[in-house]
Amino acid sequence: NGNRGANEALQVWGGYGYVHEYGIEQTVRDSRIAMIYEGTNEIQAIDLLQRKIMADGGAKLLDLLAVLEQELEAGAGEPELKEFTDALSTQIAATREAVGALLAAREADPDWSLRVADDFLRGLGFALLAWAWARSARAALPQVADAWYASKVKAARFGVQWLLPEANYRWQRVMARNAVLPEIG
């Protein structure tokens, strides 16, 4: 997502020409080279899903989700946080559902996790962002009269309303268990 974000930031200067003065060209290069040095996102996604999550039956992931659920408890009963806690709750549930389905079907369809690893990685990334946005909004709301804190709530709201909908698409793809895909090859 870093590479994508850098490329989208570059578009702000569309038509400007060479953007060296703003430093964004270096960010675009750095974000791309990091993917080359660190390995492809797909390899990282497969490693996350198969070696780290599937290998222990999702136990460590459940520990992580328990941390995310603490934020739900911290924001419970606060009407100003409902948008954020609802979004986080939805992402936690989607993550649990996806892992449960993948674990239940791993013997019948061992390649399923390979086909959806990238979508799972991105979905989990959005679940973590939903947690960060909920936490950020909760921390900023008591001081929202200050413009800096108000901007934090607005940024979190932007994330939930504008960026988080992609998570639904990612989780749909994970859950589809597209049985047609193996037949194509």
Regions found by a protein language model. Give the residues of each.
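C-terminal amphipathic alpha-helical interaction region
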Residues: 52-55, 70-185
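Alpha-helix capping/hinge segments and adjacent helical runs
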Residues: 1-63, 147, 158-184
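Short acidic/histidine-centered micro-motifs embedded in hydrophobic/aromatic stretches
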Residues: 67
